[in-house]
């Protein structure tokens, strides 16, 4: 180190590569965080980068209070905003939530306060008043907005209690207190459920569509909520229902479709799913009605959350208030244009506060994290601890893929599958079981077990037993063969086997479903998989990325259930779910229990996998047979009752067998015998 003068020291220069020379300077006083700083050498100035990641900034400006945003009472509303680099902050009050309306009521200065926050108290009852912040000339919505007007540009002050449906105080998670391995998760896009005219749902594409009961086809086959309830699943995972930016809420006539992975306001329900996006209280009230209706049907509600990136980083409200703070500089591991800097203290607080808010205010029972491998483990741990302090049964799981992201500091661990040991109780999607069963998700001609490839028997056995190498407990493995991403199960099979008959594809799809729904861990499947969901594009092609495809591609085709092959597949899924729920030995919680209860059986046919399971006072024999020829399977001693074969599944026996069982081609078989 060389001291240049009383205020400045020069540390050893460091050369990076062949052309860049980094020089590290140390100051004996703090720089202003609200002013642009430059270093000049011989008259050539260089602007200093933001200092968000310096220990001094975090120490000076980490705010830990619980009052960010608007705090309403009939007597007054208090606003608090975190804007540590701002020189001037003002609040604008509006009559409406329409960003095109010229209806400014007043503009008031806010006062700087502790830890980089600004505050103001508005006297009187301001319920229903809309507002924005003006931060050094940049207008922005409140990041902590509880609701907004149309298209999420103006926040709204709201008496949240006034939006509660009748009986909200006693509304609870119908599966609270049950282990995660008891869950059967059904992934649903809100719009897909109701858009078909055959759904007979009145509120098409709306929160309220998922509250309607008594909807059915002419033959009485239930649709909508009644269909989901009759299926036997325990949890409905909704694709993003927070406010996203890729749909113009003011133009419902355009029939716009999007999955919703374009976050705009994290704590606000999506306006296009409400019957009136112009009045902020409506979306809040209707989403609560939907949650209550699902709970009333015995279904827990999981919310798909997307904290890893935002719709447009430069336009995101947090970044307009604190420029660049919310996003990792120059990083695009999400492939959506930006990555969230979750490792920064106030971003972490924002994510934790948001999750606690949804669990408390909307009674959300679980959170599925999109690309959670871009979020740091500390943030996930703190979020789980904070939510579980008040709501101990809320589920946490997500996509733990390893992504290429540019962290703002080197000591950060990301929440990937490989970090499962640091995140007990957090589940990860098991892409191994997906690809082993159906084949590569990216290369349709790379086959899997149910599409005809010789199996990786050891890997498949590990998946069935819930002991995938990265999972510390079976509850950390979310088992699936289809989700909203990529092709549906049926389309993936059709692409892999273009010469296969429809009957063969159906048998293969049921085999895949049986493997997932009978494996240890947490079964998960895409809405419509139970009725052979397909997304055809014509000319033998299928839509493998329908995030903004029209309703004609994405809507569930309820009318198909009038045909036998669809009804039979639906009944098969119902039977598999019922059988799983009736047998605790299929839902074990610890590895030690699994190794004590389950024994893989050596099979002569390389396309056959079999397991013996002891528990609940009986023995189960589970057989998977992916060959196109039948096989004769020898049975252990005893009289065995068959509950599942390639065509039927349930809790009522289909027949009794001793000595051996003929297993049909491309099918599963499950038998039980008293122990």
Residue ranges and their predicted role:
Residues 191-362, 372, 379-391, 395:
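Substrate-binding/active-site clefts of carbohydrate-active enzymes
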Residues 474-640:
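Loop/helix patches that line or flank the sugar-binding groove of alpha-linked glycan CAZymes
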Residues 100, 105-112, 254-255, 260-261, ...:
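Active-site-proximal helices and loops of the catalytic beta/alpha 8
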Residues 22-23, 29-38, 44:
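Short, positively charged and aromatic/hydrophobic N-terminal segments
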Residues 81, 133, 188, 228, ...:
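Conserved, mostly hydrophobic/aromatic
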